[in-house]
Regions:
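Contiguous, non-catalytic segments that form substrate-binding/exosite surfaces or channel walls
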Residues: 1-30, 34-238, 242, 246
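Catalytic Zn2+-binding segment of zinc metalloproteases
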Residues: 255-266
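Short alpha-helix carrying the canonical HExxH Zn2+-binding catalytic motif
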Residues: 244-256
Length: 267
């Protein structure tokens, strides 16, 4: 079965098409009369009742958008939910990664593929977020120097991007979590996942500040430091710097880790 699925999507992608959509991301495969058939997750398809609700709430939210670009983003996303066409999703993803104005942003769709052993099928997730402007000064220092980090990365030069495009990084507060992001999201996210979009248009990185703060506070007083840290001076250093350096580690991971390097095959 695995071989059949891989061959099914390989035929869709074709040879040498670097800008092929992420085939399989929003569908279920089943067999009918011995042939593989793809059932799309759309407003009028599989899971249509739930997707109708997603579309309905997106359209209600649209009137509260901060600018015309955000309204356009919602139009593109709604179109994708209605057509199920992954080229529509790519058009939405390109517009999303280029939209930086305003305090509010969102992630919405069948995006992450961690739950699929073949790395094809997306799980639905949603976040509504707003910027932490003070903490974002930290991440923007990193993103504004992304080219320097790329040029000095200790990897084979073939994997370095000659020109880093569109790498942005913000610290945000999650106002809403849904789908696989609920009840506990990842503390950092970098999207979109399509390599060709990242190469040509860039990526967005976020560190979810109110979640990392909550996790850090929940871990206080659990006895770990008293039991395992060697002395009071080290405990004092950890109390002073551990949380901020942990956040900085997430910033570096999302912005410079996911946002860097290129496929050698492009060379």
């Amino acid at each position: 079965i695995t071989y059949e699925v891989e061959r099914f999507y390989a035929r869709m992608k074709g040879d040498g098409n670097e800008q092929a959509p992420s085939y399989g991301l929003n569908s279920k495969l089943t067999k009918r009369n011995g042939e593989l058939v793809e059932l799309k997750w759309t407003e009028d398809g599989l899971y249509g009742a739930a997707i109708k609700e997603i579309v309905s709430w997106l359209l209600r939210a649209q009137k509260y958008a901060e600018n015309e670009e955000q309204k356009h983003l919602i139009d593109l996303l709604v179109k994708y939910y209605r057509t199920g066409d992954l080229k529509d999703f790519d058009r939405y993803s390109i517009a999303w990664v280029q939209q930086h104005e305003g305090m509010i942003d969102f992630i919405n769709g069948f995006i992450e593929v961690y739950g699929d052993p073949l790395g094809l099928k997306g799980t639905w997730g949603g976040i509504v977020e707003y910027k932490d402007l003070e903490a974002t000064k930290r991440t923007q220092t990193i993103s504004q120097n992304a080219q320097w980090f790329e040029d000095h990365s200790p990897v084979d030069p073939r994997f370095r991007k000659p020109e880093v495009k569109g790498v942005t990084a913000n610290v945000i507060c999650a106002a809403m979590l849904g789908g696989e992001e609920y009840p506990a999201s990842a503390i950092g996210i970098n999207l979109p996942n399509a390599n060709w979009i990242r190469q040509e248009y860039g990526s967005k990185s976020v560190t979810i500040g109110n979640l990392t703060e909550a996790y850090n506070k929940a871990a206080q007083g659990n006895g770990f430091r008293d039991e395992f840290v060697i002395d009071e001076d080290t405990i004092s250093l950890m109390n002073q710097y551990e949380d901020i350096t942990d956040d900085l580690h997430t910033d570096l991971h999302e912005c410079l880790g996911h946002g860097s390097v290129q496929d050698a095959i492009r060379q």
